[in-house]
Amino acid sequence: MKVGVTGFYPTVPTVSSSLFKEVLPFLKPEEFPDSASVLGAHVEGPFLAPSKKGAHDAANMHIPASSSLEDIYGEENLRNRIKVLTLAPELPGALTHIEKLYKSYGVRVSMGHSAADYEAGKRGMSAGANLITHTFNAMNPLHHREPGLAGERYPEYFWKF
């Protein structure tokens, strides 16, 4: 396929670890000659801020510091299926997970469903996160005294005079 949507990341919301392990094997990267290709999975959660959870099930949410990536998703899924993962960088242990996802598994980390302030967003970016999920939604608003995640990630758009 040469025009239009040529590839996409199917998204899995916050679910139980057993359901992640059941669903993710079906979302491996795969090319389809006459259709959009599956680029791998985008996983939202379970490391999200409870105050910004939106429709995500709080019963399945985890704190990164007390949860192993491998236990939640399975190592095979981390290596070969998950290509983008959204988490809240301000949670305890999130920076360690960001660095491990990026360096050990090659997963692109997106910050979202987060109550992070500018500094927490900056620490997330320094650890390896390079995307924002739902910019301006499920996060604190952009404010002139507290720019938050959006202000940290996209300063060139907001700070021009």
Segments the model singles out, each with a brief description of its role:
Residues F32-P33:
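Active-site-adjacent helix-turn-beta-strand microarchitecture at beta-sheet edges
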Residues M1-E22, A36-A49, L78-E90, V107-S110, ...:
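Divalent metal-dependent hydrolysis catalytic cores, especially in the metallo-beta-lactamase
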Residues V12, A55-I63, R108-G112:
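Active-site mouth loops of central-metabolism enzymes
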Residues A65, P89-E90, H113-D117, M139-G148:
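A general structural motif
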Residues M1, K28, T96-Y105:
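Surface-exposed amphipathic alpha-helices with a cationic face
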Residues A49-G74:
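Conserved phosphate-binding/catalytic loop of the ribokinase/pfkB sugar-kinase fold
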Residues H97, A120-F161:
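Active-site-adjacent C-terminal substructures of enzyme catalytic domains
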Residues F20-L24, H56, L69-Y73, G93-K100, ...:
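Distinct, well-ordered alpha-helical segments
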